[in-house]
């Protein structure tokens, strides 16, 4: 099924029952669970569901869960107790399971046949309490899981499963992600630092560091013919500032920007890296801070973090993977400054250069402007304004004893006025529930100033991702009440291990 967004992945559908009811019932369970899988696949799930034979005993369950854990293509398991499946049989299997779990609380029939219902029907269709038995053991074992309730034909059920699958795809990709840091983090900045060993333990991502001189060698080795081809692509794809066109006064700067992109692409490809960071304080032999190169690489799905921010680079990569095939975009972002007019408080988000063009449906303009930081030549960048759309803004921070996700839903809006003198790509948004509550809660949670902003996924995928990755989540949305949020954060702080100071 190569038309799926994730043809390389699959999720397994496990049905629980027992031999108490006889072979005819087990045959019916198998037929009906297969029909559910076929219906869900036909409903447009992003990851193919694979039906597995009905499970009736502890040995079979443990083997199936162990097999799922050992199968790279399997990124998650959906469990459903069609009849009553005594949950002690699931204990060892659930303890062996190392893949995300979704508990689907559904049944084969949409309605009850009131006039003909008998005990044969009742014995076959008893997920109402069979799933409660399974739920008890999952809760007793504290298994991270998502519970979806409703008939499998319900569009809301399909959307919930699809969101969970997308989160599972993001986590599966992250567990094989290799990230390269070109240089270290920005000097004296706290939130971009962190425990890279803990991140690999928790998320599975390998984080490696190379000197910027290694990238500089690649830049020097780029063939001029390859630069010619990429420059032609730039000229065709973007509204080019006249000074950057062939024969223009700054055309050589565009050619050097193309060299940076080609060098970065080859380095990432050869090292099997799918995320990377740069740092304007550590540019070595590079003549420009990479701008258009980073923007185009993000547009192709690479994760990125500025100033050595590897946590945000991993997060951008994960969210881009979750959003594969969806409208909208995902980008590295930074809350830059506020519009505090009481009638409409807004955030203006941007960065020096590096905002992903997937956030706009317009043709970006390719420009060159001075950059005060870095002490290098003026960098080439794409300039645009993000399209109005619902969005979620997510940050990942190291709290010392755990990793925390902080997320805020928002509405991207058009700027109240044009921005003719702002030489960078940008987004303007109204955070939920409003700026005062959102910013106060974000700061109280220790949320970072670098984030992944997405108009493609929602808080639903982020919540599922946090749970399956074992990350603490602080979600700020339209339902957030400030005092309650602050009280919850303070209560969390009181449960942390005692500090040495």
Curated annotation (Swiss-Prot):
Needed co-factor(s)? Mn(2+)
Q: Does the keyword Isomerase apply?
A: yes
Write down the EC number.
5.3.1.4
Show the Gene3D superfamilies listed in the entry: 3.40.50.10940
Task: Read off the InterPro entries from this record.
Answer: Ara_Isoase_C, AraA_central, AraA_N, AraA_N_sf, Fuc/Ara_isomerase_C, Fucose_isomerase_N/cen_sf, Lara_isomerase
* Keyword terms: Arabinose catabolism, Carbohydrate metabolism, Isomerase, Manganese, Metal-binding
Lineage top rank: taxon: Bacteria
Q: Where is the signal peptide?
A: none
An example Gene Ontology cellular component term from the record?
cytosol
Any GO MF annotation of the entry: manganese ion binding
**Pathway where it operates:** Carbohydrate degradation; L-arabinose degradation via L-ribulose; D-xylulose 5-phosphate from L-arabinose (bacterial route): step 1/3
Q: Which GO terms describe its biological process?
A: L-arabinose catabolic process to xylulose 5-phosphate
Instruction: Answer yes or no on keyword Isomerase.
Output: yes
Q: Which reaction(s) does its UniProt entry say it catalyses? A: beta-L-arabinopyranose = L-ribulose
Q: Which residues bind Mn(2+)?
A: 307, 334, 351, 450
Coiled-coil boundaries: none
This entry's comment on the bound cofactor is:
Binds 1 Mn(2+) ion per subunit.
Q: Which Pfam families match?
A: AraA_central (PF24856), AraA_N (PF02610), Arabinose_Iso_C (PF11762)
What does it do?
A: Catalyzes the conversion of L-arabinose to L-ribulose.
Per the record, the similarity remark reads: Belongs to the arabinose isomerase family.
Q: What is this protein called?
A: L-arabinose isomerase
Which gene codes for it?
Answer: araA
